[in-house]
């Protein structure tokens, strides 16, 4: 009943045949759909590409001094250190761990060097001030609950503390995530930030 029809896959939806392409198809018979071109690749090509990207990442981890690295058949990485070859495994040495710790410490505080943070220093400081004042007022309220004082209610400190803490936490977290480039966080959404 049914002739041997080729199976349709999602990749076929992105390819234009000669009759779909219009008056000027490309010479290969498959027209490009705008700037994107989808083509099928064999599984071994994808696996080979994945292996190369892992080796590139491994080389970035292992080569702190910028030496050239090439993959070795046994899975290690060889580097050229002033003329002689040495093979290192992918395990980190103590010096690599300490230098990566130093880099992570610098990366932790590097968000303060962002140009928009420097330009809007007052807004950032006000956000931290809201956070700290809110924490202090809440802690004073907790202290009054633990050791009550006659004539002073802890609610006087809790309510303003929460009212200051919530926007302070929101702005500090939002600014930090925007500097780090997290998806959905942009300085454009903070009305007091000058762009």
Swiss-Prot record:
The keyword DNA damage does not apply. Residues 14-33, 48-84 are annotated as: Disordered. Residues 144-154 are extracellular. Keywords: Cytoplasm, Membrane, Phosphoprotein, Transmembrane, Transmembrane helix. It is found in: Membrane; Cytoplasm, Perinuclear region. The modification Phosphoserine is found at residue 93. InterPro entries: TMEM134, TMEM_230/134. The keyword Transmembrane applies. Disulfide bonds: none annotated. The chain crosses the membrane at residues 123-143, 155-175. One of its GO terms (cellular component) is membrane. Residues 1-122, 176-195 are cytoplasmic. It comes from the Eukaryota. Pfam families: TMEM_230_134 (PF05915). Residues 14-23 have a biased composition (Acidic residues). It is a multi-pass membrane protein. PANTHER family: TRANSMEMBRANE PROTEIN 134. Belongs to the TMEM134/TMEM230 family. This is Transmembrane protein 134. It comes from Mus musculus.
């Amino acid at each position: 009943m049914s002739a041997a029809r080729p199976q349709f896959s999602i990749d076929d939806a992105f390819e234009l045949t000669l009759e779909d392409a219009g008056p000027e198809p490309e010479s290969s018979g498959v027209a490009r759909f705008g700037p994107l071109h989808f083509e099928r690749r064999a599984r071994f090509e994808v696996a080979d590409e994945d292996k190369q990207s892992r080796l590139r990442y491994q080389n970035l981890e292992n080569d702190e001094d910028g030496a050239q690295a090439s993959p070795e058949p046994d899975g290690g990485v060889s580097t050229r250190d002033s003329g002689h070859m040495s093979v290192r495994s992918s395990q980190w040495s103590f010096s690599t761990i300490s230098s990566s710790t130093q880099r992570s410490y610098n990366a932790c505080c590097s968000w303060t060097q962002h140009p928009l943070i420097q330009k809007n220093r007052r807004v950032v400081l006000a956000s931290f001030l809201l956070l700290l004042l809110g924490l202090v007022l809440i802690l004073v309220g907790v202290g009054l609950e633990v050791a009550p004082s006659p004539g002073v209610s802890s609610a006087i400190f809790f309510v303003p503390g929460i009212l200051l803490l919530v926007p302070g936490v929101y702005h500090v977290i939002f600014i930090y995530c925007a500097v780090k480039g997290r998806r959905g966080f942009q300085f454009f959404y903070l009305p007091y930030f000058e762009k």
